[in-house]
């Protein structure tokens, strides 16, 4: 009988630390969107912008609630939402991303990728311990390289 390749799983402590930082990342996005809703409501007069920010905040709060319950699909939805919102900010709102903001996008994207992997391993039961789920330095380098590749792609303005 041939057994599947099963690398050593990450320790529970490492998974909980990554999961904690993942939750903090989502909280930071939620607080930022609430700030935008208040800012848009106080400074801008049109009703659309504050309502859009409030809807984004409610959606992120819903995703956070589902991720705290360790539902893997919602972690992937959160990652896709983050990428789509960066494309929206860059292409529809024509927001310029400088080096500092691209660095922040890189850090958030790396934490969201690692958190998505950690949520998959903390879910009951984790079906398979794949190479990426070991979360050693090689896996972190892979996630950072993927984030480094995606960051300029999702922060570039293609429509102007």
Where do the protein language model's features map onto the residues?
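Topology signature of small-to-medium multi-pass alpha-helical membrane proteins
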Residues: 1-160
């Amino acid at each position: 009988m041939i057994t599947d390749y099963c690398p050593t799983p990450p320790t529970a402590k490492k998974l909980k630390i990554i999961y904690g930082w993942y939750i903090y990342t989502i909280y930071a996005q939620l607080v930022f969107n609430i700030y935008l809703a208040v800012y848009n409501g106080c400074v801008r007069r049109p009703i659309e912008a504050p309502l859009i920010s409030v809807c984004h905040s409610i959606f992120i709060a819903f995703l956070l609630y589902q991720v705290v319950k360790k539902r893997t699909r919602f972690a992937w939805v959160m990652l896709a939402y983050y990428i789509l919102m960066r494309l929206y900010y860059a292409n529809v709102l024509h927001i310029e991303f400088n080096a500092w903001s691209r660095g922040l996008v890189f850090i958030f994207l790396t934490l969201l990728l690692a958190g998505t992997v950690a949520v998959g391993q903390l879910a009951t039961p984790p079906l398979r311990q794949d190479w990426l789920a070991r979360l050693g330095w090689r896996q972190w380098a892979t996630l950072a390289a993927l984030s480094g590749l995606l960051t300029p792609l999702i922060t570039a303005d293609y429509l102007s």
